[in-house]
Design a protein with these regions (language model features):
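Transmembrane helix-loop junctions at the membrane interface of multipass transporters and ion channels
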Residues: 553-576, 740-750, 771-779
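Juxtamembrane inter-helical linkers in multi-pass membrane proteins
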Residues: 437-441, 494-524, 599-623, 667
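Core alpha-helical transmembrane segments of integral membrane proteins
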Residues: 398-498
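Hydrophobic core segments of alpha-helical transmembrane domains in multi-pass membrane transport
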Residues: 407-418, 480-485, 563-565, 578-592, ...
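Conserved C-terminal guanine-recognition region of P-loop GTPase G domains, centered on the G4
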Residues: 162, 187-253, 558
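Conserved G1/Walker A P-loop phosphate-binding module
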Residues: 94-175
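Extended, low-charge hydrophobic alpha-helical regions
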Residues: 354, 361-362, 381, 422-463, ...
Length: 779
């Protein structure tokens, strides 16, 4: 019997974990080990994947992977006897950073020079409050989300009040195994950059799972403190942790904190500075029983690889553990001789025979056994929190078998409706009136001052009309980001990945791929970067190539401008239709990519579903301000320069003479060279072609360019039909993304793939626009 056969609500004991490779190792690291109790919570609306409860936390995996895990006969967890461990409730006051010899290794401390910078790595599981702590420590305002893997790149900052420090916020990981790109980034930083100290943040509501990573970090021999985050939630729900006792068992300082409330931060910083300054390494790195087969195996291998580990820059204990697990990256860097490999293999096989487990399972079991002992003696588990109970009730509706998909469609439909037809549209109209009022005022002032006609035209027709036409759409963009931020911060984005995994798998993608693509509706740049959370290079590349097909917010001004001019009675419908066209084309391209560039199976789906929570007002406001500021910077930098340049090229010929007819201008000559390519699409006017070219710099420039070149919508309507306008919209939706997005693709995948994106999207856009023009002409 396997997990796949377990009904929802039933529990069983894991007997064997099948499979092989990095995925199996990842399962072991996540706690799916022999002897562990697993409970099936629910199946996704489409029947796949399945949500499990293991070691007091929730995990989702696919049925094809669940089929690899053999379990005992099912039972109801309520009927199983559970030992209720009670402990002394007297809690001693936690000592300060300079007190208590057992909390700091005084004997082996090795003080650094006073002028040496103290570098720290901030490491922890995904969604444990790491970025919140980073913001508190540094005073930064990095985006905080309620989705596993928000941090996809390292971020640096200086700890407030300590100018000679540098702390790096690393991507969230579950172990030091190289399963995903985030884990590789974090591991390489710790092993190669060698920070002076580690601040390991743990989710106190789930210490058991979080300590698995802590044990691997302690093997590195880097000075370390543990920040036990969310202790306020533990106390509220009746739980507690004997801090002094857990410090003795782990051999590193443990500080209870609440990053969200700023509690315990000063003490955490004091301990971190102290261990880094005096280079006090963890006092414990051996977590197996002295007489166990695993202990003999690891120490036997340590003696064999000592020289190789020193040469590769790896701590012996860490390297030995990874050799037993079969970590290919570590084995490659150790450069072992063939006879050494054979001796090591003999030692490991002997250990497997004595343990009755395979090598990777034995190491994972050793760690979890130690963790279980630590938690049994130091932790009183909190009762099920109100947040968890509330999340379960909400999930019955939002991830229910018959309600999950309809609710997703309804929620996204409501987001687009409110953005384009109610809130965003209303605010955009108000701002447009204000911009028009200011423009008319400046126009009258310049006229009264009898300013030179050329300069007058530049200021009004170029700058105010060009930049102002783009600024009026700022409310729509901010409104869209507001709703996307609410969905992410609340935890719903993770549910969307859970709901859509089976459907996306048919397209050759993982459910996690939907999150970068949903982010792409806001902006392609963070959407492309978010693909780093995917462990498979195949899935990652495919997701990066598909994300720009999702209509980013920078294209909203184009849709709104053309909809108001050509389809005033159906403006909202046309704008929403653009999003659906992008999705449909993305699906078609996914099928094509699956059969050509990206053959094979998508990455396995392994993810946590966080509790729902109320989005933090500060976080939402900060995100909106960042997006608005980014838009305004574009408006007054790229778009400002582009409008002046376009105005100049429209009003002067190649001899720099002022032209009476813009068809004789520099712009007309340049655009005229490629205009024939667009005539079959219904918009063969050089001014529209020019707008497309400027849109490569920033999509918002399309509207400002058209506003300058045509002067009025009446003129534009006279040279292009409604069918041509629809064709133009489809082309703008699908053609090459902006320079910033292309640069992000180049950064993630390299120049070759960035060139592919430009070429593929231009070809697809031309074909789609032609089909649109033909169909619209018939209708």
């Amino acid at each position: 019997m396997t997990i796949k056969d377990l009904p929802a609500g039933k529990s069983a004991t894991i007997l064997k974990v099948g499979g092989d490779g990095a995925l199996r190792q990842h399962f072991l690291d996540m706690g799916l080990i022999q002897g562990a109790e697993v409970t099936v919570i629910k199946y996704a609306p489409m029947g796949d994947p399945v949500e499990l409860r293991i070691h007091s936390y929730e995990l989702t995996i696919r049925l094809s992977d669940a089929e690899q895990i053999e379990v005992s006969e099912p039972y109801c967890i309520d009927n199983k006897a559970v030992e209720n461990v009670k402990m002394n409730s007297i809690v001693k006051e936690h000592p300060g950073f300079g007190e208590g010899g057992r909390y700091h290794d005084k004997e082996n401390e090795n003080p650094l020079p006073d002028d040496e910078k103290l570098t720290f790595a901030l490491v922890g599981n995904q969604n444990c409050g790491k970025t919140t702590l980073f913001n508190v420590l540094t005073g930064s305002n990095q985006h905080i989300g309620n989705f596993p893997g928000v941090t996809v790149d390292r971020k640096d900052g200086v700890i407030k009040g300590y100018p000679d420090t540098l702390i790096t916020d690393l991507p969230g990981i579950y172990s030091m195994s190289p399963y995903s790109s985030e884990e590789i980034v974090t591991r390489e930083f710790l092993l190669m950059d060698k920070p002076k100290g580690i601040i390991n943040i743990l989710d106190a509501t789930n210490i058991e799972r979080n300590l698995y990573l802590s044990m691997q970090l302690m093997e590195l021999g880097i000075p370390m403190v543990i920040a036990l985050n969310m202790m306020d939630e533990v106390r509220v729900n009746g739980g507690s942790v004997r801090i002094n006792a857990i410090e003795e068992l782990l051999g590193v300082p443990v500080i209870p904190i609440s990053a969200a409330k700023g509690e315990g931060i000063e003490e955490l910083v004091s301990h971190a500075i102290h261990v880094a300054k005096y280079q006090e390494k963890p006092q414990i790195s051996d977590f197996c029983s002295k007489d166990s087969a695993v202990h003999r195996c690891i120490h036997g291998i340590m003696s064999l690889i000592s020289d190789h580990a020193d040469k590769a820059g790896y701590p012996e204990r860490f390297a030995a553990s990874k050799v037993v697990e079969g970590d290919s990256l570590v084995l490659k860097h150790l450069e072992l001789e063939q006879n050494e490999k054979e001796m090591i293999e003999h030692i490991i096989v002997q250990m497997e025979e004595e343990c009755g487990m395979d090598r990777a399972s034995a190491i994972a079991d050793m760690r979890f056994a130690y963790i279980e002992d630590v938690c049994k003696n130091t932790v009183v588990k909190p009762r099920e929190s109100k947040e968890r109970i509330r999340s379960q009730k909400i999930d019955k509706l939002l991830t229910g078998k018959y309600t999950g998909i309809p609710m997703f469609i309804a929620i996204m439909g409501l987001v687009f409706y409110l953005t384009f037809n109610v809130i965003g549209a209303a605010l955009s109209n108000v701002l447009d009136i204000l911009i028009t009022f200011v423009t008319n005022g400046v126009d009258n002032l310049l006229t009264a001052m009898n300013v030179n006609s050329v300069l007058h035209a530049l200021i009004i027709d170029g700058i105010f009309y060009g930049v102002g036409s783009v600024l009026s759409f700022l409310p729509i963009i901010v409104t869209l980001f507001f709703f996307l931020s609410i969905l992410e911060d609340s935890g719903y984005m993770a549910r969307v990945a859970f709901i859509m995994d089976k459907l996306l798998r048919k397209l050759g993608l993982s459910g996690r791929s939907i999150v970068p693509m949903l982010i792409g509706f806001g902006c392609s740049v963070p959407g492309v970067m978010a693909s780093r959370t995917l462990s498979s290079e195949r899935d990652r590349r495919m997701t990066v190539l598909l994300t720009p097909f999702m209509s980013c917010s920078a294209k909203v001004p184009i849709y709104a401008f053309f909809s108001a001019a050509f389809f005033p009675h159906y403006a909202a419908l046309v704008m929403i239709g653009m999003y659906f066209i992008g999705i449909i084309v993305g699906i078609i391209m996914a099928f094509i990519f699956k059969k050509t560039l990206f053959k094979g199976e998508p990455v396995p789906f392994v993810m946590e579903l966080p509790n729902y929570r109320m989005p933090g007002a500060k976080n939402v406001v900060h995100l909106l301000w960042e997006k608005a500021k980014d838009f305004l910077q574009k408006a007054f930098s790229i778009i400002f320069i582009a409008t002046i340049l376009i105005w100049f090229m429209q009003n002067f010929d190649i001899r720099l003479n002022v032209v009476a007819d813009s068809r004789q201008s520099i712009l007309a000559v340049l655009a005229g060279m490629i205009t024939p390519l667009f005539k079959p699409l219904g918009f063969g006017d050089w001014r529209l072609v020019t707008a497309i070219l400027t849109g490569v710099m920033a999509k918002e420039s399309v509207v400002s360019t058209i506003s300058i070149l045509f002067g009025s919508t009446i003129e534009m309507v006279s040279v292009i039909s409604a069918a041509g306008a629809m064709s133009f919209l489809v082309f703008c939706l699908l053609y090459t993304p902006c320079v910033a997005a292309i640069a992000s693709v180049k950064k993630e995948l390299g120049g070759k793939w960035a060139a592919y994106v430009v070429v593929i999207q231009c070809v697809v856009a031309w074909i789609a626009a032609l089909i649109t023009y033909i169909i619209a002409g018939i209708l």
